[in-house]
């Protein structure tokens, strides 16, 4: 599969200039449905209409406007927006370096891969190796599609990844949520049991293990319908009742985990006997 870059520019690192290309690191895998007319099954079309002129408008007739008062707009052109972009807008300007643990994941939005061009490989390797050695990530600013973005550069695999980030004012406060259990007293025994349950479920992260079960069910369902097969409904998940005794629930959960781990370990022991 041909991978195409979505942006070309450079990383500015002190007096070092690193020409790079930007590539999307993620892609959506959701099952997409088309909206069809129920009677004839043809796709629904959406038209851009002006309610005042009562007619459809073309893309050339559409402009951007900011509503500064109810029903009142100031028109902003694309040229004006581009004129507001700072000089060096094709540059990822590194401002500082921080430890990854200092940034909460809530700040990260989207991930991209950074690839050096032929003349920037040595400088790229230098930055990557320095970030790896210091266990740091770089905070930078860049203009993407006329919009200034706060980004973080870090080592990922053999290269560098760039995460777009939210600004602090874009993250909502938790204060309006009220009391989040801070006034509730938890006994030392309950705390110990909860920690024990967490420890028993702790394991190395294996990304392959985490697949979208719902997406697979939808795909199987669609394939069955396309092939004219009988549709089998999924069994209903038992409704979980209200937990009355927290300690009993924790004990039962720990026992359930132990039982499951024994079942998973049994086939491995059986295989060892056969190979010995």
Swiss-Prot record:
The keyword Flavoprotein does not apply. Keywords: DNA damage, DNA recombination, DNA repair, DNA-binding. One of its GO terms (molecular function) is double-stranded DNA binding. SMART domains: Ku78. Gene3D superfamilies: 2.40.290.10. It holds the Pfam family Ku. One of its GO terms (biological process) is DNA recombination. Residues 256-276 are annotated as: Disordered. It comes from the Bacteria. Residues 11-177 form the Ku domain. Homodimer. Interacts with LigD. PANTHER family: NON-HOMOLOGOUS END JOINING PROTEIN KU. With LigD forms a non-homologous end joining (NHEJ) DNA repair enzyme, which repairs dsDNA breaks with reduced fidelity. Binds linear dsDNA with 5'- and 3'- overhangs but not closed circular dsDNA nor ssDNA. Recruits and stimulates the ligase activity of LigD. NCBIfam families: Ku_bact. Belongs to the prokaryotic Ku family. This is Non-homologous end joining protein Ku. It comes from Heliobacterium modesticaldum (strain ATCC 51547 / Ice1).
